[in-house]
């Protein structure tokens, strides 16, 4: 009972900053509370989530913020998902390269070969917390996001987009609220690895299928269908 009370108190204090500023709580964190704090050596997935949060904000606000560096990332693990609470520094080229502190919350879910990334929050840290952690976005899927999603790869060789929305110009399909992207790319299975057995495996072509949806509240979700990840084209 005492441990349960400590956990409730801990999560209550985490919620006060919406999961972002928790480093002062980590020394007293109960062992049963699965929250990880990181301020260096971020992996590829953290960078992907940071870029995705900035991407949503740019398309919503009409800005062109660019990732400069990541300050910290808190990740909360549950039985069904991982929530990333990322504080980063973004550069604003339109303001002479000035730097702004940015926060984004991205949730990663994995359901039997279907992986989803959902952006619940994307904002400047100086902005007041919204009543709900959901914001609208008129977003496209930028090439920087594509390049990170299919790591490790050398290059994207072709892309196609399907949407049921009434879009006249082909390039406008990238901005459709609901669309399916088919990306063919060159995959290097031994990139960054030491040779084993008979040596390196040759590069091969693969296909990535990414579905983007936005509900009536503007919640941005990317769904990755990995069932075709090993399909050779």
Swiss-Prot record:
Coiled coil: none
Family stated for the protein in its record: Belongs to the UPF0725 (EMB2204) family.
Protein name: UPF0725 protein At4g17990
Lineage start: Eukaryota, Viridiplantae, Streptophyta, Embryophyta, Tracheophyta
Database matches in InterPro entries: MS5
Pfam family, one: protein_MS5
